[in-house]
Design a protein with these regions (language model features):
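Short regulatory helix/loop adjacent to the ATP-binding pocket of P-loop NTPases
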Residues: 113-118, 134-142
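Clamp-loader machinery-focused feature within the broader ASCE/P-loop NTPase space
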Residues: 1-112, 116
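A short beta-strand-to-loop transition that corresponds to the Sensor-1 phosphate-sensing loop
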Residues: 102, 129-134
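His-Asp phosphorelay/catalytic-motif detector in bacterial-type signaling
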Residues: 122-126
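Short, structurally constrained coil/turn elements
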Residues: 55-57, 121, 141
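Catalytic P-loop NTPase motifs of RecA-like helicase/translocase cores
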Residues: 106-107, 121, 136-137
């Protein structure tokens, strides 16, 4: 598990324990400098939860990031890619995983729209926010 991840030994141990113990949270915030492996770690975690080798072939996985040429991740994008989909139960497996990369670009409206799902998610949903800092988020998100 997490063989492709270099370093991050403490995090690997923690997440392995969570997976084996069935103690999976509905939301995670991975933050830190660019290039330290946050997205790679999130994707490996998603692979473990979904029991797949290739996330792109899984119907239970969505990767969300800023659309090309856009300054922010806007409410319409969050509604379309996450909120409209989140209440459909997984077709296979126990989880639906949503990774929001560069989540610091979620504008205020998008954060507010996401808040209800973060506060009252379906039991099968895991949302992973990836950002350079926590300071970009509304206090209610953190």
């Amino acid at each position: 598990m997490f063989e492709k991840i270099i370093c991050h030994d403490e995090n690997k141990k923690l997440f392995e324990k969570c997976i084996h113990g069935g103690n999976i949270s509905h939301a995670y915030l991975f933050f830190g400098k660019d290039g330290i492996g946050k997205c790679t770690f999130a994707k490996e975690f998603a692979k473990e939860l979904l029991n797949v080798e290739n996330l792109d072939s899984s119907t239970e996985y969505k990767y969300i990031s800023r659309l090309e040429g856009k300054k922010d991740i806007v409410i319409e994008q969050i509604r379309k890619e996450l909120i409209d989909d989140v209440y459909e139960r997984p077709l296979s497996g126990n989880y639906k995983i949503y990774i929001i990369d560069d989540a610091q670009y979620l504008n205020i409206s998008a954060q507010n729209a996401l808040l209800k799902t973060l506060e009252e998610p379906p039991d099968y949903v895991v949302i992973i926010l990836i950002a350079s800092s926590m300071s970009y988020f509304l206090p209610t998100i953190i």
